[in-house]
Regions:
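Active-site pocket-shaping loop/turn-to-helix segments
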Residues: 72-90, 138-145, 163-175, 211-226, ...
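Active-site-proximal alpha-helical scaffold in enzymes
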Residues: 85-95, 146-149, 154-159, 163-195, ...
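Conserved beta-ketoacyl condensing-enzyme motif
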Residues: 15-16, 37-152, 156-157, 163, ...
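A glycine- and small-aliphatic-rich helix-loop capping segment at beta-alpha/alpha-beta transitions
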Residues: 30-33, 118-133, 185, 207-216, ...
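Short beta-strand segments
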Residues: 20, 110-112, 167, 192-198, ...
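Solvent-exposed alpha-helices and their adjacent loops that cap or buttress functional pockets
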Residues: 6-9, 100-103, 133-134, 146, ...
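Acyl-CoA/ACP chain-elongation machinery
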Residues: 188-211, 215-217, 250-262, 287-300, ...
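Condensing-enzyme catalytic core mediating Claisen C-C bond formation in acyl metabolism
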Residues: 9, 13-17, 22, 30, ...
């Protein structure tokens, strides 16, 4: 009898092998990288006629029009958050999706979002003020559900693998990346698109304006999406994709009161470095969340002793809320692409959300 060779386990190392961004710099990762590396401020004066909001400036995607970008088919009732997500998923697949279509059941999407408060409020208003017998446009109801951008993106781009929506404020992008890592290690997919999206809207602006920002003035709001192709190093090589970064680990904690956010983040950072067997002095690049007020000061304190260049994204693109950490991760990849000396160096991305979540993700670049 001839013994059947045991199947070789797939490589467990998870890598980022592609990325796409829709941001206040415009469509595409090139415009994002150029604006970020030049230090160009992407926020600008708000057109009060189009956007009656209590903000003088914001980081809007320039000239973004869903029908102009995606066409009229299937977009009549699509809201802004969904449109941003669908566009960014399409860009990532177009540039890095070679071979993924061969097995769509093994390619999925993990998208972080805050949902669309504009869609929720508009639909509620229609339900209370609309004319009988219908009162509301039923085609717009899906926009009120948080997983609408994820589901619509998967349908439009034929992603039949795991379809997951996560939400965690400013830490959402890191939470999505971590969730996708768990799915891949559990054998639920061969490749996952992971990231986060956020929309600018009148209702979001009004809510954010009256929120607690740690005793500081609220930052201008931003919008956009950043998505990353996550897979094993082996799968990346088979697909002809270059490894842009290896995910070494993530850690998250909750803090019960705002004064303890810094201590919680410091523990996350210490743990993720220890798990990777590296020290604070080994970090070459840090992309902090830089929230306003006391949270920002606590983040600075938590990162004392961590080496490396700091990348501040929020002052350039505004407060992108759910997309914030995803933009920070995209900024790390943009810097790595422009600086060959960063290959095989470590990058740290951190996030603090005022609702009680902190997180840290460690990457090895190249």
């Amino acid at each position: 009898m001839t013994a059947t060779p045991a199947a070789q386990p797939r490589e467990r190392r998870l890598v980022i092998s592609g990325w796409a961004v829709t941001s206040p710099y415009g469509l595409g990762r090139r415009s994002f990288a150029e604006g970020l590396l030049d230090g160009t401020k992407a926020t600008s004066a708000v057109d009060g006629g189009q956007w009656p909001v209590p903000y003088g400036e914001a980081g809007l995607i320039p000239g973004f029009d869903i029908k102009a970008v995606l066409g009229r088919k299937g977009t009549r009732s699509m809201d802004r958050a969904t449109g941003i997500a669908v566009v960014t998923v399409g860009e990532l697949l177009e540039d890095f999706g070679q071979g993924l279509a061969a097995d769509p059941e093994k390619t999925g999407l993990v998208l972080g979002t805050s949902g669309s408060v504009q869609s929720i409020m508009d639909f509620t208003k229609d339900a209370l003020t609309g004319e009988k017998p219908y009162l509301v446009d039923p085609a717009r109801f899906p926009n009120t559900v948080m997983n609408c951008p994820t589901g619509q993106s998967a349908i439009r781009h034929t992603l039949k693998g795991p379809n997951v929506t996560v939400s965690g404020g400013s830490a959402t992008g890191l939470l999505a990346l971590n969730y996708a890592s768990r799915l891949l290690r559990g054998g639920h997919a061969n490749a996952l698109l992971a990231g986060a999206a956020e929309e600018f809207s009148v209702q979001r602006a009004r809510l954010e304006r009256v929120a607690d920002h740690g005793g500081a003035e609220a930052d201008p709001l931003g919008e956009g999406a950043a998505l990353f192709l996550l897979e094993s190093g082996e799968a990346a090589r088979e697909g002809g994709r270059r490894v842009l970064a290896t995910v070494l680990g993530s850690r998250f904690r909750a803090f019960p009161e705002s004064g303890r956010a810094g201590a919680a983040l410091a523990r996350c950072v210490a743990e993720v470095l220890a798990d990777a067997g590296v020290g604070p002095e080994d970090v070459a690049l840090v992309a902090p969340g830089t929230p306003p007020g006391q949270l920002g000061k606590q983040e600075e304190s938590a990162l004392e002793g961590i080496g490396g260049e700091r990348i501040a994204v929020r002052p350039l693109v505004g407060d992108a809320t759910a997309a914030s950490a995803a933009f920070q991760l995209a900024a790390v990849l943009a810097h790595a692409g422009a600086q060959p000396a960063l290959v095989d160096r470590l990058a740290l991305v951190t996030a603090l959300d005022r609702d009680g979540t902190v997180g840290a993700t460690l990457l090895r670049l190249g």
